[in-house]
């Protein structure tokens, strides 16, 4: 029996283009008998797909094997690619097909595009995405923020209006329970705060720590926002559900901002309110060494004689925590409050 005669390879046809997406291209080839795997592997034809480098005008192998289909992945959207097929015979001879050119498709609109448009304050792109109807307006980003939350936090008032007009829910919350109004109050964006209030945002909403928008506005320290919130009817002495702190208590604990504290007190905040542990704003200000705030609270009627749950007063606390400047202040105030002894002649 004569040995099988291997014919030299003829020039193959270019690979056929199958399914094309924004990041992949399917290529396949049908070479009749050459694709059949008969006999030992050394008698099979081997196929390679090569991709052209448009800058260097060279080719790189992206697939080699015995299959008749390959999906090229990890491609860029709307980009032209050129491929050729290399067929290698069992004897090692090879032939190349003509080139085939194919472009990937446009990347489909997704939630990432929505959040990207908001992040860079691109009004036109945001409108186009929303008008396309393929992306839900309230889909959160990877941090759990809706597009409205991001726009409110950044102070992009025009984007806020676009999102609200397209049906976004102004009362949605992120993973920590904060809504768009809280974020805008903390960041000090008064125009956004006013707009959200007109469209249903509530002062009563609470985050997971039980804090309201006024607690966050106090932390942010933006007096114009706080002043407007008070005029709009926001409760001044609202208590969080965690520590039992009012906004004034948070000022004493966090920033020590005298202007914010003064605004709250003038609007009716109780300077002698107690938290769950019996501490007053004055005690908390002393512990955090906010000397000027301590002075303000005393001037506004804070009672320095109040004791906490352990029977300790503010002067004892200041000494224990070595708040020397506060100790001096409290001692000076105490001296001034002592009644003068009458002179006996």
Curated annotation (Swiss-Prot):
UniProt xrefs under Pfam families: Ank_2 (PF12796)
Record domain Fibronectin type-III: where: 8-108
GO cellular component terms attached to this protein's record: chromatin; ciliary basal body; ciliary base; cilium; cytoplasm; cytosol; nucleoplasm; nucleus
UniProt name for this protein: Fibronectin type 3 and ankyrin repeat domains protein 1
Superkingdom of source: Eukaryota
GO biological process, one term: positive regulation of DNA-templated transcription
First and last residues of every ANK repeat: 109-139, 143-172, 176-205, 209-238, 243-273, 277-306
Subunit text: Interacts with COPS5; regulates the phosphorylation of JUN and the transcriptional activity of AP-1. Interacts with RYBP; may prevent the ubiquitin-mediated proteasomal degradation of FANK1.
Annotated organism of origin: Homo sapiens
Compartment(s): Nucleus; Cytoplasm, Cytosol; Cytoplasm, Cytoskeleton, Cilium basal body; Cell projection, Cilium
Post-translational modifications: Polyubiquitinated. Polyubiquitination leads to proteasomal degradation.
Role, per record: Through the activation of JUN and AP-1-mediated transcription, may regulate apoptosis.
Alphabetized SMART domains for the sequence: ANK, FN3
Database matches in PROSITE patterns: ANK_REP_REGION, ANK_REPEAT, FN3
Comment, domains: The fibronectin type-III domain mediates interaction with COPS5 and RYBP.
Matches recorded under InterPro entries: Ankyrin_rpt, Ankyrin_rpt-contain_sf, FN3_dom, FN3_sf, Ig-like_fold
């Amino acid at each position: 029996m004569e040995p099988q005669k291997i014919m030299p390879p003829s020039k193959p046809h270019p690979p056929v283009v199958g399914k094309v997406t924004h990041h992949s291209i399917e290529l396949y080839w049908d070479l009749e008998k050459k694709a059949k795997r008969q006999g030992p592997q050394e008698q099979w034809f081997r196929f390679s797909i090569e991709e052209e480098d448009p800058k260097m005008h060279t080719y790189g192998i992206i697939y080699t094997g015995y299959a008749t289909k390959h999906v090229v992945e990890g491609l860029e959207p709307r980009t032209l690619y050129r491929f050729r097929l290399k067929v290698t015979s069992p004897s090692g001879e090879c032939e190349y097909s003509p080139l085939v050119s194919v472009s990937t498709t446009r990347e489909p609109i997704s939630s990432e595009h929505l959040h990207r448009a908001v992040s860079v304050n691109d009004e036109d792109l945001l409108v186009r995405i929303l008008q396309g109807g393929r992306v839900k307006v309230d889909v959160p980003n990877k941090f759990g923020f809706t597009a409205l939350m991001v726009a409110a936090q950044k102070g992009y008032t025009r984007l806020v209006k676009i999102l609200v007009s397209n049906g976004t829910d102004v009362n949605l919350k992120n993973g920590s329970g904060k809504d768009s109004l809280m974020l805008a109050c903390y960041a000090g964006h008064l125009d956004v705060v006013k707009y959200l209030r007109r469209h249903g945002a509530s002062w009563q909403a609470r985050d997971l720590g039980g804090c309201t928008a006024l607690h966050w506005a106090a932390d942010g320290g933006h007096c114009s926002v706080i002043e407007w919130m008070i005029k709009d009817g926001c409760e001044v002495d609202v208590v969080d559900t965690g520590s039992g702190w009012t906004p004034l208590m948070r000022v004493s604990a966090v920033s020590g901002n005298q202007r914010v504290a003064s605004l709250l007190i003038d609007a009716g905040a109780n300077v002698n309110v107690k938290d769950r542990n019996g501490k007053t704003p004055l005690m908390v200000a002393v512990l955090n060494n906010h000397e000027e705030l301590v002075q303000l609270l005393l001037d506004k009627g804070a009672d320095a004689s109040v004791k906490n749950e352990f029977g300790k007063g503010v002067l004892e606390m200041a000494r224990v925590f070595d708040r020397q400047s506060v100790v001096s202040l409290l001692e000076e105030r105490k001296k001034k409050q002592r009644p003068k002894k009458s002179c006996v002649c």
